[in-house]
């Protein structure tokens, strides 16, 4: 769907569908007030009412949508409102529709237009790749959304459309990748998708296979992947190396294309959802897509450890001791705590770039879902300034993060009696000890870990712009944080 902006009087605009957002206390403009019955409209948040003007206006249809109380404007609610409008436009089978940009206190036309664009594109997302019996009309999408703005706000709104569109396309790429079945998205295929992205934006990419990883000493990734016929890959994409004076930010993603648990095998119930155990890698690729589209003046290095964790005659075992890329030794106590082992090598490699910050994203622990549920990302960091930067970005982007502690007693819990660290510590503080394990592999560099295990997948539809399945979480937070970095 193409999104554009134009200036004009909404009530004089000829369109298949005119979307007009109204606050609870806002009066209906004439002649709309004469076209509905008293009591049919209140303006409560997300209420909708479809009106057929029948010649009273140039628009063929008008969709009123409630914005709630004017005293509590909310960009995330604007995303939801835009998603609802777009979905209704698709239901009505219109080719194009217009949306009047509301005025929100403490927000600019750019931020509001960005939120509307995000919500519309995220709300129109559907994963239909494996639906073989759909008719063409069932795959039909709206062609164009036109935002209506005052003349003096058109340029600002256009910038918002560019930003919101890039972010939404990045999120939807991440959703696509995490929704793919594991028989189609193997580590090798994930590397191919990464290469397609790199080629599209003319970015340098390096993909290491098992032989190259063995030669360089990637003992963690190799061990986790050795039980599967689908061999692991290590992927690096380098963006913005020409920005020599800009910070270097490393984005590290866990890319388990399927996680059976290995020898410490998971229960059968819900194991199918473990195709999304590469959501961290998906978020990194989605973010990089948006970064490249927006041409952010930063040096960003995307690093992904991709593997499949399977039981088998060659699988790694509880009791094994692994030598990682850093030289540190890991005692394996549970093969289902594999993501941290993969990330140990990825985080070690990231240090070669001497980054200003390393940010990793991973569906790392079920414990974070128990602690925070589906409403917040678990955030851990060895640098308070970096942590607060990410918290602020999450609030602004609509992807909240909550910081948990990494005190020394937690770091003591991951120490091994017979190796340097152990990959499992029991039930207590599971999300924290997993982060403490990762902390052992980042050196002295500022580092943050985003545990997205509770937010990467949804079996419901918690928000209008968030369908069932992969959420693409992390992309919006990262883009907001990186944009803030360019303005610091």
UniProtKB/Swiss-Prot annotation:
Protein name: Probable cytosol aminopeptidase
Cofactor(s) needed: Mn(2+)
Cited SUPFAM superfamilies: Macro domain-like, Zn-dependent exopeptidases
Catalytic activity field: Release of an N-terminal amino acid, Xaa-|-Yaa-, in which Xaa is preferably Leu, but may be other amino acids including Pro although not Arg or Lys, and Yaa may be Pro. Amino acid amides and methyl esters are also readily hydrolyzed, but rates on arylamides are exceedingly low; Release of an N-terminal amino acid, preferentially leucine, but not glutamic or aspartic acids
Molecular function per GO: manganese ion binding; metalloaminopeptidase activity
Family: Belongs to the peptidase M17 family.
Subcellular location: Cytoplasm
Catalytic residues, chain numbering: 266, 340
GO cellular component, one term: cytoplasm
Annotated binding of Mn(2+) 1, by residue: 259, 336, 338
InterPro entries the UniProt entry points to: Leucine_aapep/pepB (IPR011356), Macro_dom-like (IPR043472), Peptidase_M17_C (IPR000819), Peptidase_M17_leu_NH2_pept (IPR023042), Peptidase_M17_N (IPR008283)
NCBIfam families the record matches: PRK00913.1-2, PRK00913.1-4, PRK00913.2-4, PRK00913.3-5
Sites where the protein binds Mn(2+) 2: 254, 259, 277, 338
GO BP annotations, alphabetical order: proteolysis
